[in-house]
Amino acid sequence: MTPDSPLMPVVLRRRSSLALALCLLCVLCPQTLSAQAPAPGLPITKPSDVGLSLQRLSAIGDWLRAEVAAKRIPGAVVMVARGGKLAYVEAVGQRDPTIPAAMKTDDLFRIYSMTKPVVSVAALMLVEDGRLLLEAPVARYIPAFANVKVGIEKTDAQGNKTLDLVAPRRAMTVQDLLRHTSGLTYGFFGDGLVKKAYQDANISAGGNQTLAEFADRIAQMPLAYQPGSTWDYSNSTDVLGRVIEVASGQSLYTHLKARLLDPLGMTDTTFYVPEPARQARIAEPWPDDRSIGVNAPVFDPRQIMPMESGGGGLVSSAPDYARFLLMLRNGGQLDGKRYLSPATLAFMTTDHLSPAVLKTPLYLPGPGYGFGLGFAVRTSAGEAAYPASPGEFYWGGAGGTYMWVDPAQDLFVVFMMQSPRQRVPYRSVLRNMVNAAVIERLPAAR
């Protein structure tokens, strides 16, 4: 990368979104980039024009290339935007470590739980439409939840544990699904009798079941906690996907595609990848790094299955997800089309966990963060191990993907890789290196 180049030269093969392709193809001629007309909705700028240090941004690419050379990750794509403009794009390493093909910026990644913010936004769009209520019981949309029970562990004098089933103190609501206070859980990590029951019943999002069948099955399982009492990472957003289906009268993907993905130009964001040309662009992890948890192998998006997992099933690209984040950065609109009102988006990215809500030991948002409706939300400048502004929001995926939006810094970042074992340490390093590149303040976007 030359000192005056705002972006690493890359080659794009994306044809499905002409505006986005034209925008990113500008990086083929970095010396003349400033003279290029930006594409609508995703313009490019020089780092120095938005208060970023090119030298410090370039260090991110150097770090990632060193990690690839050390065979710790196969490859990665990173995008840094400020002031609503892409200021840095880098693709390093290989798309698939078993095939000698360089990573491209528009390659496809299993984004796992970065599906959750997309589905959460779709749910709030239905709220704005008047077709969904956050305070409504989940049972209004999925009747099987009308008879749900809470599992209470008891231990006798000999140390034997049993599970008593009791009625919930209140109904599980749609808002509970969005903020992970539903009482549902995940069975592939942690311990306890409810989690063991999930494992024994093979409760997982995927396989040869429809979303409706999955929702009915998980409704028969005991809740790990009283609804509203405890934050526990869970299949809540999968159940939310079924709520969206019932409220909209469409399959989850049909609804996402019509209301969000196609209008945003996110044509590479799908649950499955049946097309051979797109299959060739799927990023893969190392052969010995293909599990995200107990009995949870990395899924194969080439195989079309009945279920569309709202909690972790989407495949996407860095440019697609950048479009989604740019819409959020813009207060809910992009290219003249509004998806959410500014008030609704502010509501989503506000902490929804009162002091009375307990947090499990595996509290994924981390110190200094609460949780909104689909996002972890920074609540204080301190506590966390890296700088961020109060109001910053983020989330990531089990396969290694990560994103954050910092409205006070007018900054957003997309990071894509397929390295499940490396996902946590790389996030903090990336945060610190991006923060180091912010050398001037800009007015907040909103």
Model region roles, listed by residue range:
Residues 53, 116, 317:
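Short, conserved phosphate/pyrophosphate- and ester-handling motifs at nucleotide-, phospho-/glycolipid
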Residues 19-31:
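Bacterial N-terminal signal peptides
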Residues 58-65, 78, 84, 109-141, ...:
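Active-site SXXK
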Residues 40-41, 140-388:
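Short, surface-exposed loop or secondary-structure junction motifs
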Residues 402-404, 410-419:
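Short, well-ordered beta-strand elements
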Residues 4-20:
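Bacterial N-terminal signal peptides that target proteins for export
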Residues 34-35:
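Boundary at the C-terminal end of the N-terminal hydrophobic targeting segment
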Residues 42-111, 131-133, 147-156, 298-299, ...:
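Short, conserved catalytic-motif segment at the N-terminal edge
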